């Protein structure tokens, strides 16, 4: 059931309605093992409902879905053993340290040597320096990284990142993006739900656009770009965005400051040539 030929997630003709209002209207997609699959849609598109069905928290009205080869309706216990769900609300205990949070989850899952498990995850997610601090002192980015580390205890083959960067500042978002990429590099299958276009573009191997309860497009970034008309060559003056300015100022030891200066200089030169 869990051979490489079987998709990590398989969804077929999935439907769900609330009081005769269709939320999911025949959703179909597959997620390949070890890949990052982005489910892109605005608020109300049906992303959360779909995640709740895949994580066995909600039953579909019609259609089928499987995770790691297990049917979400008839093999719910096996599905729950195969996945971990984390998102915009970090499920951490603020009165405990980072290490204590990790060890607590390892003990609750009856795993051997919780201390070693915690140390390995602290190192993997660059949390060693913050390991002995109470989580109440953590920044948003640190909390999110700890939450994702906690979700990997027990090594679930599939992790669902549900709106993982909502409410984070630009630097913390980039930190979470890096964690997502590392998960896939280690063989974990990642289902990412997001409403941020840049997030899907940066992370996903494939992107499905969910709109009004239906998948209206599904493909790689290159395939989706082919849906647009042929590109036209235009000469424009590009000014740095506020995010460019922010990251240039607070980047690692100011290494991006020359980039900001070059961007401004290039823009000025382009204006002079025009």
Describe the function of each predicted region.
Residues 84, 103, 107-130:
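Conserved ABC ATPase "signature" region
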Residues 218-219:
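ABC ATPase "signature
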